[in-house]
């Protein structure tokens, strides 16, 4: 008891240092949060470690200091409940600190050695799960002495509060020693690997400027809303600073807490007794490491924030004005065809669609009634890359009824000219099992074989909505149909304004794969009248004034349109040989001054419109 009476002399120092550590760690957490726009795994682990230090000096160390000061009075002594609370909280926070430092070093090694795998493996979620596991294991093991896992012959709370592991019990002491020793060893190994890899990369970057870098990838939906993002490679200076900070934290912890706790625990278990110097060593080391962590955070320029930034962060937190960060990293590989810089703004109206003929396109699927046209632009390493997630991909869990899951756009009831674009996308889309069933183009797979005319140039004649096939009565009595709920095949016709003699969508060497079909023979047809363009359909006498009745059948136009369909239109040279130089250039006019897009003009393709 005389040795324990020397402990109250250090209680005042513990309280003062504990108060300073509490304020410093709180400032460190605010500084890290103010310097970062969103929470990242490494910053999250640093803040968790600082919060663990705050709890350690606020609960067990403060409790022990106050009790030691109160013990100077003869009428006060430790009781069983207070001693159990102190032992459980102290060892819980000691183990949590040890595991947090090891997790910090492991995440840094993972990020430095395997940067792509680290960014694609949802490291943020793994860091959260790691912290939850750390606290669960630490609490379960440290709470066992309070419920009976201790030496029953002489309990640790009978004479004062002897919290060294040898006084608690042999089983608890061995488990605690193994956990702390293994965690310290793993932290040292991970830190050494991360430091070596960082220095090697720095030397390699100086020797080779073409070092591999991970691009910053931002995931957005079809409406442009940011869903998630993947951070790119760190700059050389930032990477070196962060690795140096983690190395310093691990080194200081091992020197001030890891190895001293191992030495004290092993010595007490070997001697089966505890000494006053053991309690003094463990408590002072805990306070010292809690004081040094904010100093290291302030020394790193990446996490050093001024008073103004911290004040703005606090005001944003109190006003709940901070944007909600629901972004999560991708949980797997990224399909290369989804990596886009941005989606193309497409125009819609009447019988034309605006296209940029200087870009290469692919018509992915009908989402919301119109094909989405994406420019395939070359990836740039110094810019963010964007992933476009279509609505049906996001609602893939409810693809039984895609019309109920995806809100229909306002222009969908006007299915007349919109279906022309649908059939156009059907012609150039590749057929096969890779087509998504949730897409609106799935109606083409359910059609009878008589409608599957993708290999013939006359399939361009199937551009007519089903509402016109049923006559004026059916068009008035029934709402406009959708591609998935359209009735079976029937005689259909199309406007001649969409039929050029040569289908020049873009530069032919950049055409989609569906347009690269081998040339096939076409049936002979009467020649075009004199004075008319070979690729232009002859205008019937009644075409100047449209009749309100239904359009004529497709067979009535086939004969007049076949002369303009060249048998060699699948070859690059066939674009000029089919209808001369006028038809190809008139199909895509020059870009306008306002938008810069080329426009499909119906008056240059025929006179039926």
Swiss-Prot record:
Q: Give its localization.
A: Cell membrane
Location (main, coarse): membrane
Q: Where is the composition biased (Low complexity)?
A: 458-479, 527-536, 584-596
Chain ranges passing through the membrane? 12-32, 42-62, 85-105, 127-147, 176-196, 244-264, 277-297
* Keyword Membrane included in the entry's annotation: yes
Task: Please name the Pfam families in this protein's record.
Answer: 7tm_1
Database matches in InterPro entries: GCR_153/162, GPCR_Rhodpsn, GPCR_Rhodpsn_7TM, GPR153
Keyword field contains Transport = no
Where is this chain compositionally biased, Gly residues type?
A: 571-583
- List every stretch annotated Disordered: 446-496, 514-609
Molecular function terms in GO for this entry? Answer: G protein-coupled receptor activity
Q: Would you say which domain of life the source belongs to?
A: Eukaryota
Which keywords appear in this protein's UniProt record, sorted alphabetically?
A: Cell membrane, G-protein coupled receptor, Membrane, Receptor, Transducer, Transmembrane, Transmembrane helix
Q: How does it sit in the membrane?
A: Multi-pass membrane protein
Q: Cytoplasmic side: which ranges?
A: 33-41, 106-126, 197-243, 298-609
Q: Please give the residue ranges for the topological domain Extracellular.
A: 1-11, 63-84, 148-175, 265-276
Function as written in the Swiss-Prot or TrEMBL entry? Orphan receptor.
Name this polypeptide is given: Probable G-protein coupled receptor 153
Species of the source: Homo sapiens (Human)
């Amino acid at each position: 008891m005389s040795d324990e009476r020397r402990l109250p002399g250090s209680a005042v120092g513990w309280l003062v240092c504990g108060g300073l550590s509490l304020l410093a760690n709180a400032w460190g957490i605010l500084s890290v949060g103010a310097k970062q726009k969103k929470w990242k795994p490494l910053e999250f682990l640093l803040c968790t470690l600082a919060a663990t230090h705050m709890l350690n000096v606020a609960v067990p160390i403060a409790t022990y200091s106050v009790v030691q000061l109160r013990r100077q009075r003869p009428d006060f002594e430790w009781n069983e409940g207070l001693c159990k609370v102190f032992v459980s909280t102290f060892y819980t926070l000691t183990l949590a600190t040890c595991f947090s430092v090891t997790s910090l070093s492991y995440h840094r090694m993972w990020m430095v050695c395997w940067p792509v795998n680290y960014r694609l493996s949802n490291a943020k979620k793994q860091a959260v799960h790691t912290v939850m596991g750390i606290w669960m294991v630490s609490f379960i093991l440290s709470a066992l002495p309070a419920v009976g896992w201790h030496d029953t012959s002489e309990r640790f709370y009978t004479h004062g509060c002897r919290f060294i592991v040898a006084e608690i019990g042999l089983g608890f002491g061995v488990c605690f020693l193994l956990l702390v020793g293994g965690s310290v060893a793993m932290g040292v190994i991970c830190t050494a690997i991360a430091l070596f890899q960082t220095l090697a990369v720095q030397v390699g970057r100086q020797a080779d400027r073409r070092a591999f870098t991970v691009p910053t990838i931002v995931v957005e939906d079809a409406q442009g809303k940011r869903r998630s993002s993947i951070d790119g490679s760190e700059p050389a200076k930032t990477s070196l600073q962060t690795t140096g900070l983690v190395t310093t934290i691990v080194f200081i912890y091992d020197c001030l807490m890891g190895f001293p706790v191992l030495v004290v625990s092993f010595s007490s278990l070997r001697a089966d007794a505890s000494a006053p110097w053991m309690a003094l060593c463990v408590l002072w080391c805990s306070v010292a490491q809690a004081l040094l962590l904010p100093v290291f955070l302030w020394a790193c320029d990446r996490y050093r924030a001024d008073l103004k930034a911290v004040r703005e962060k606090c005001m944003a937190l109190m006003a709940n004005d901070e944007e909600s960060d629901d972004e999560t990293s991708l949980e797997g590989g990224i399909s290369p065809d989804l990596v886009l810089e941005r989606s193309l703004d497409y125009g819609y109206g009447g019988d034309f669609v605006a296209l940029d003929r200087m870009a290469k396109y692919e018509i992915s699927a009908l989402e919301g009634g119109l094909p989405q046209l994406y420019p395939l632009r070359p990836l740039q390493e110094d810019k963010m890359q964007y992933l476009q997630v279509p609505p049906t991909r996001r609602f893939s869990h409810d693809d039984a009824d895609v019309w109920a899951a995806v809100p229909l756009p306002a222009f969908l009831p006007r299915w007349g000219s919109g279906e022309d674009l649908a059939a156009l996308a059907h012609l150039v889309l590749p057929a096969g099992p890779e087509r998504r069933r949730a897409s609106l183009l799935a109606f083409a797979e359910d059609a009878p074989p008589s409608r599957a005319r993708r290999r013939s140039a006359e399939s361009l004649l199937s551009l007519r909505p089903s509402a016109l096939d049923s006559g004026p009565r059916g068009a008035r009595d029934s709402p406009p149909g959708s591609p998935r709920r359209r009735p079976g095949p029937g005689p259909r016709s199309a406007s001649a304004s969409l039929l050029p003699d040569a289908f020049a969508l873009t530069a032919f060497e950049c055409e989609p794969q569906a347009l690269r079909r081998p040339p096939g023979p076409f049936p002979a047809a009467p020649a075009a009248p004199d004075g008319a363009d070979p690729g232009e359909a002859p205008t019937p006498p009644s075409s100047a004034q449209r009749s309100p009745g239904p359009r004529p059948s497709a067979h009535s136009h086939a004969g007049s349109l076949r002369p303009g369909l060249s048998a060699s239109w699948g070859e690059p040279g066939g674009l000029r040989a089919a209808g001369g130089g006028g038809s190809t250039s008139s199909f895509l006019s020059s870009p306008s001054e306002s938008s810069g897009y080329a426009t499909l003009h119906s008056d240059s393709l025929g006179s039926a419109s």
